[in-house]
Amino acid sequence: MKTLGFIGVGELALYTIKGLRRGGYDGAILLSPRNRDKAALLQRKFDCQVQVDNQAVVANSDFVVISTRPEDCLETLAALRFRPGQVLISVVAGIDIARLGGVLNENLKIVRAMPVSSAEAAASPTLIYPEHDYVRELFAYCGNAICVDREDHFNQGSIIACVYSWFFALFEALTQATQGPRLPADVAAELVMGMAKGAAELALASRDRSPGQIAESIATDGTFSKLGLDLLKTEGAFEPWRKACKLLEQQLAEND
């Protein structure tokens, strides 16, 4: 099994490594020493090895994950000396392969990946570009690896990684709307999140129908489901979601 090194040990590295280990990945994982508290936690609980500096991580790894903050990424990479045959995996948002490659001392294979925090629960739908067999296998430990063959597809897909965080706010709003004297908050929360999980699993298992068609097949005339769905449509409840996605799309275009 290949040796995996992480440059940058923040929250993203933390939940990705937790997911790798909990998913069954047992290869060596090397860490940069920058964030001492998180690095020490990962060394103690998730069988990682803290190196003396970033260059030591690169020197001793086959695959190197760059997981710094975007503003630090290129400067950090430019200071490192890679060797032929290594693979760089970037989980840094907003920096394309051309810019990453432009600061490297070697012409490396570069793969972009976008795990989300559900990786910690081995449930991240991780977007990957370009397809790479080992990188796909790696992120499958954290959930599901989804490969695309164009970088603009990857960039557009990154919007959905942001939508992921909005779901939590929706879960909170629905829990607050349904809890009360007739339903305890913890039961409401479990039902809301369980229904969301069930709906997603049904939609994934029913690719012959769109999610909208599934909704219409359930929310039929005379049902409470239709009563509520019709109100949501009348009130334009879904339009702000479209606008929020368009806002992020515009921001991505400005950053290109």
Residue ranges and their predicted role:
Residues 99-109, 124-206, 247, 251-255:
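Internal alpha-helical scaffold of NAD(P)-dependent oxidoreductase catalytic cores
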Residues 16, 20, 39-43, 76-80, ...:
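Hydrophobic packing residues within well-ordered alpha-helices of enzyme cores
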Residues 29, 39, 57, 73, ...:
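Small-residue helix-packing motif on alpha-helices
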Residues 53-104:
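Rossmann-fold NAD(P) dinucleotide-binding segment
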Residues 193, 197-256:
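NAD(P)-dependent Rossmann-like dehydrogenase/reductase catalytic/cofactor-binding core
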Residues 1-45, 49-52, 56, 179-181:
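NAD(P)+-binding Rossmann beta1-loop-alpha1 motif at the extreme N-terminus of oxidoreductases
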